[in-house]
């Protein structure tokens, strides 16, 4: 792999500095004595990837097994799990190859390793982009189900969902390939950052609007039962906590990665930014943690899915 030192798990494209930007690599004395670098061990990185790989594979298998789950909503959830599976799988593969190379158990020509590195980079980037897209698609699907409940099944049909899924996958592969090919252009990094911010704003606006509507609905029910304040406030607090957790996890897991991209453009040679650059492996680990958390938030809350999952696990034994 085209990797060096403590950051050997950087995507090949992000392990190099764009030619339009000053050199990213900082010497130890440039980053300062107080520079904090969180080391992610090979074992931890590999373990997180394997847990995410197994968990998301179970989600995909469960949805595929049960025909009752072949709906637009579960189609998006299944594709989110598949994206997270690819994110984890590509990082597990890269880590395994690196460990085998370091141990001398694997010998390969530089050209072969470079091609493998490029393939892994494209898979990782495309799965990251598609994962963000499917998180947004799930938010849009839930929004339509609440605000257009009577027309939901005519608006969100399975053929339309499949076309949306196909468009997301094709766009993710195309743009990730362009990203790998033109990683030395600042515009590419800015586009990725803008895309992340757009997904964050989209999810925040939709979920906040859904929470407001749910609170209004609870308030109306409370009025009918003459118990407005306790019910409304309790429901609003629970909804606010749920929303905070959902958006907080998304921002915590994805934010550092895109902060890294932003700082590459804004301050590639600043000592403080250099400290942040040193923790890129941590940022990748956080994205894999998000891949572990996603099924808990979007999939396993379904009683039907949990029941089918038990059947899948029983059959596997």
UniProtKB/Swiss-Prot annotation:
Q: Per UniProt, what is the membrane topology?
A: Multi-pass membrane protein
What is the recorded phenotype of mutating residue 51 to A? In CMM5; moderate decrease in coupling to the cAMP pathway; reduced cell surface expression as a consequence of retention in the endoplasmic reticulum
Residues with a covalently attached lipid (S-palmitoyl cysteine): 315
Residues bearing attached sugar chains per UniProt: 29
Per UniProt, the keywords (alphabetical) are: Cell membrane, Disease variant, G-protein coupled receptor, Glycoprotein, Lipoprotein, Membrane, Palmitate, Receptor, Transducer, Transmembrane, Transmembrane helix
Q: Drop me one GO molecular function for this one.
A: hormone binding
The record gives the effect of mutating residue 92 to M as:
Probable risk factor for developing melanoma; predominantly found in type I skin; shows a moderate and not significant decreased of cAMP production to NDP-MSH stimulation
Recorded hits in Pfam families, A to Z, give: 7tm_1 (PF00001)
Name the InterPro entries for this protein.
Answer: GPCR_Rhodpsn, GPCR_Rhodpsn_7TM, Melcrt_ACTH_rcpt, MSH_rcpt
Medical condition linked? Melanoma, cutaneous malignant 5: A malignant neoplasm of melanocytes, arising de novo or from a pre-existing benign nevus, which occurs most often in the skin but may also involve other sites.
Q: What does the UniProt function comment say about this protein?
A: Receptor for MSH (alpha, beta and gamma) and ACTH. The activity of this receptor is mediated by G proteins which activate adenylate cyclase. Mediates melanogenesis, the production of eumelanin (black/brown) and phaeomelanin (red/yellow), via regulation of cAMP signaling in melanocytes.
Q: What is this protein called?
A: Melanocyte-stimulating hormone receptor
Query: What is the protein's species of origin?
Result: Homo sapiens
Biological classification of the source: Eukaryota, Metazoa, Chordata, Craniata, Vertebrata
